[in-house]
Amino acid sequence: MNRFFAIVYLVVATAAIASAQPATPTPSPVDPCAALTTRATRAETRLRDWPALDRYREANSTTTPPTKDENRVVFMGDSITDSWDDPRYGGFFPGKPYIDRGISGQTTPQMLIRFRADVIALKPRLVVILAGTNDVAGNTGPTTLQAIEDNLASMFDLAHANGIRVVFASVLPVSDYEKTTDGQPIVRTKQRPPEQIAALNTWMKKYAAMHGGIYLDYFSAMADDKGFLREELSEDGLHPNQKGYEVMAPLAEQAITAALKSRS
């Protein structure tokens, strides 16, 4: 119990400091007490299980080995992958031997820690890695492009060492088009500068080409002439809506097909 109150105190103190800084408005107002409780609970969970290994532990334990001819694919990622199996978006590739292992809010160091349990142990033919946007935003603290690239390279190399082919998916564009319920702009590009996203995508494309992987370019298909996430593809300037996933799905299928046909 004392630990819980200590976490609450830490969250309150952090919130007080953050309130003095200009912040990106949230999409909708929330009850302060409920928000504080939620943040304290998340903080406690992160203390116990920072990489969220427990999230898929049970599901992994009941996942049977792939059949001889099964082209099993695991999707590793953050909220964009995590939300893909939401019924609102038509489900996660119905009828396909694809496994969703996305976790909302995660960064590449967290994914790297759980990569063996959530990808390698499931024995897929291929992994699709969509990661990096939360690193750029600093979800788990300050970082550098070099550190993000190192984590992505480590996941790539771990997969290859275990006979798993790799698709590197580009980080999606973001936009500043959306507004909160009280009309305030949601400025996504402040936390996720487009030039950093572009640099990371350029690196992934080059790394995949040099090491026998496939680069999946969501960015070009989803960006407008300003380089922003097209307004009709998102409700919050960050996450795809149904139309967004409808753009992404066939691109993912094309990349998977290409990767499975490759000899690397």
What residue spans do the PLM features occupy?
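Soluble periplasmic/extracytoplasmic beta-strand elements of cell-envelope proteins
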Residues: 74, 99-100
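N-terminal secretory targeting modules
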Residues: 1-75, 81-82, 86, 91, ...
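Catalytic nucleophile serine of serine hydrolases
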Residues: 79, 102
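Alpha-helical protein-protein interaction elements
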Residues: 1, 25, 42, 48, ...
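Short hydrophobic segments within beta-strands
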Residues: 76-77, 169
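Short substrate-entry loop that stabilizes the transition state in hydrolases
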Residues: 83, 107-108
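Alpha-helical cap/lid subdomain in secreted, periplasmic
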Residues: 90-97, 106, 112-264
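Short, flexible loop segments at the rims of nucleotide/cofactor-binding pockets, characterized by
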Residues: 48-53, 103-107, 192-193
